[in-house]
Amino acid sequence: VGIKDGIILGIGDYEGEKEIDVNGAYVAPGFVDCHIHIESTMVTPSEFSRLVAPWGVTTVIADPHEIANVAGEKGLKFMLEDSKNSPIDIEFMLPSCVPATPFDDSGAVIDGDLTKELLSKYDFKGLGEMMNSVGVVNCDEDIMKKLDCDCIKDGHAPMLEGKELNAYVCGGISNDHECSNEKEALEKVSAGLNIYIRQGTGAKNLDALIGAVTPYNLPHFAFCTDDKHTEEIMKEGTISNCIRLAIEKGFDPISAYTMASYNGAMMNRLYDRGAIAPNKIADIVVTEDISAQNIKYVFKNGQLIARDGKVNFERVSADSKDVTNTVNIKKM
């Protein structure tokens, strides 16, 4: 694989100033986690990158829903700033439900007007998971304001079906990660949604869903973790774990890697990555086994960021003073 200035030149008999012999190992595109709440790991984005990079993750689509509910715009700004020095790409979605429900007491409120302001003010990839499916289906005025944006709109619609599902999709929602069985996943694919098969700490849906994926609908499936604890990431990885589990279930390995990289990139309009091909970003995973459990090298933009399970970069953190001391207890 020839690389120059972080871009893949091609595959063939190339000579370079620096060469690495991978000794017959497998070479794959960097993995994409299509939906995660970094706060669930209990670490900052800059430290999170050190957790997942050795496991081959080079791009993450993160929804900072939890910190937004506590610290509002200040929390969002911290997450964006703290991720800037990460060698992996952390793309943030703007949380769409702050508070999560109208009955919650939260530290902030992001309504339709503020949503539009924040989308124009900061570099958000799109709108985070729309949990208020009832509001979408019934055309709630404030929800409609939030959906009136030219960007990716993540979904959250457990067990939604029939005409209600159709109405939800008409709101411009493009994906869902809440499927719990094959029937639900296939109905949502038929309705035009992309499906992120989730394998996290609390919710583990891969076993129940991987059978729904066929060669015909493969482009509509990718992987995500949603919420995964640090100790589990250290033990088994994130997207690499999805690859392993899928292969153990008898799933085609090439299709598993496609879901782990190319599909997730395309679904999130990241057309410059997801393949070992000319003019793509040199995000590359070198693994000694097909199940991606013995990852030897991880490259981001052509630079070595992890080797043999160890990161090759230091953590650079943003100033966190605006998002600390946020627990307030009423005086007795």
At which residue positions do the language-model features occur?
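Active-site neighborhood of phospho(di)ester-bond hydrolases with catalytic His/Asp-centered motifs
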Residues: A28-H35, A62-H65, M93, G128, ...
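Active-site microenvironment of metallo-dependent hydrolases
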Residues: K4, G12, A53-P54, M234-G250, ...
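Divalent-metal coordination cores built from histidine and acidic residues
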Residues: S49-D154, Y216
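Short, ordered loop/turn segments at secondary-structure junctions
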Residues: D13, P64-I67, P95-C97, N132, ...
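Divalent metal-coordination and catalytic microenvironments
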Residues: V1, G6, G24, H35, ...
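Histidine/acidic residue-rich metal-binding segments in metalloenzymes
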Residues: V109-E129, G135-I197, A203-F223, M234-E248, ...
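Histidine-rich, glycine-flanked metal-binding segment
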Residues: V1-P29
